[in-house]
């Protein structure tokens, strides 16, 4: 019993000590052929890195304003907007993580311990994973809303927080797997070229997970569009011409929205997925395209910059609130603050009070789930 446990203890100590060994980074980068490429960066940050950092700064600023817009506007304190806020937070963190990644790259890489390297890369995985899982959570929430044809039920908030919590827990686990042991520190032949301390099986696993997420998002949005089309046909069958016409317009708007959402997501992420699959299949130093991974990664990060535009600024009410927040930041005076406290849309408070006192509040078009699904993805439910 003792004889079998001693080697295990030695192996554990060796594994733990490897996380603080600076030579491991050099050894793995040399094996994958990235050592000479990294040496070219000794003289400072490359121009492309500066451009990427500027893009990240824009992404960070953009998502900060989205969070401020949701926080400052009480009518956006609703379950659907919690998902938009969570998406903005994950996109903001993706911008921060990639900026830190760029600043700690190049010659600085060889000054990192494996543990620090895992934290540098793992933070990127966590932020980008949270962003993708947030997109899935938004699609799930919209699909459930369309099925129930209700926006205001008691379970919405708890379901929202449950989905948001699941996004972050799964993302943290996914990003933390390498530092917890799923790496190639003790197996050079299994190392990724793009990420030299990551095991190829882990890269394949992550690519598979993200591909399944993409397919799930595609299926959910197609189902949402199908539900809206079915409702439109029912109205036509009942010869309710005015409602059928409005529903058809919403269906068309929803179709455009779905195409934009899925096209942008695929355009940003598909190149990186393909690159990672090549990474799994190629032997070390055989695929030159793998040494250009930063261009594929920044494209995925760009998705964090397009999300606020697609999910926030295409909504008229959120766009007006967003512009008002930006205006307040540009002109921080008493008048601006006073203006912000007024209704975002003239007459909104008056019309809402009448609706609240009405015996049929559901007939307000703003409460129609179809409105939320069309016209810029998310419209106010009030």
Curated annotation (Swiss-Prot):
Residues 69-82, 139-160, 225-257, 311-382 are cytoplasmic. The modification Phosphothreonine is found at residue 236. Expressed in a wide variety of tissues with highest levels in brain, heart and spleen. Lower levels found in kidney, liver, lung, muscle, placenta, thymus, and uterus. Very low levels in intestine, stomach and testis. According to PubMed:9931453, expressed modestly in apparent endothelial cells surrounding some blood vessels (e.g. aortic trunk). SUPFAM superfamilies: Family A G protein-coupled receptor-like (SSF81321). The chain crosses the membrane at residues 47-68, 83-104, 117-138, 161-182, 197-224, 258-278, 290-310. The modification N6-acetyllysine is found at residue 10. The modification Phosphoserine is found at residues 351, 353. Glycans are attached at residue 30. It is a multi-pass membrane protein. Keywords: Acetylation, Angiogenesis, Cell membrane, Chemotaxis, Disulfide bond, Endosome, G-protein coupled receptor, Glycoprotein, Lipoprotein, Membrane, Palmitate, Phosphoprotein, Receptor, Transducer, Transmembrane, Transmembrane helix. Its main location: membrane. Residues 2-46, 105-116, 183-196, 279-289 are extracellular. Disulfide bonds join 184-191, 282-287. InterPro entries: EDG1, GPCR_Rhodpsn, GPCR_Rhodpsn_7TM, S1P_rcpt. One of its GO terms (molecular function) is sphingolipid binding. Residues 371-382 have a biased composition (Polar residues). The modification N-acetylvaline is found at residue 2. It is found in: Cell membrane; Endosome; Membrane raft. Residues 348-382 are annotated as: Disordered. Disruption phenotype: Embryonic lethality, due to impaired vascular maturation and defects in heart development. Embryos appear normal up to 11.5 dpc, but after that they display massive hemorrhage. They have a normally arborized vascular network, but present excessive sprouting angiogenesis and severe aberrations in vessel size. Their aorta and other arteries are not properly enveloped by vascular smooth muscle cells, causing hemorrhage. Likewise, small blood vessels show a marked reduction in the number of vascular pericytes. Residues 351-366 have a biased composition (Basic and acidic residues). Belongs to the G-protein coupled receptor 1 family. Interacts with GNAI1 and GNAI3. Interacts with CD69; this interaction promotes S1PR1 degradation. This is Sphingosine 1-phosphate receptor 1. The lineage of its organism: Eukaryota, Metazoa, Chordata, Craniata, Vertebrata.
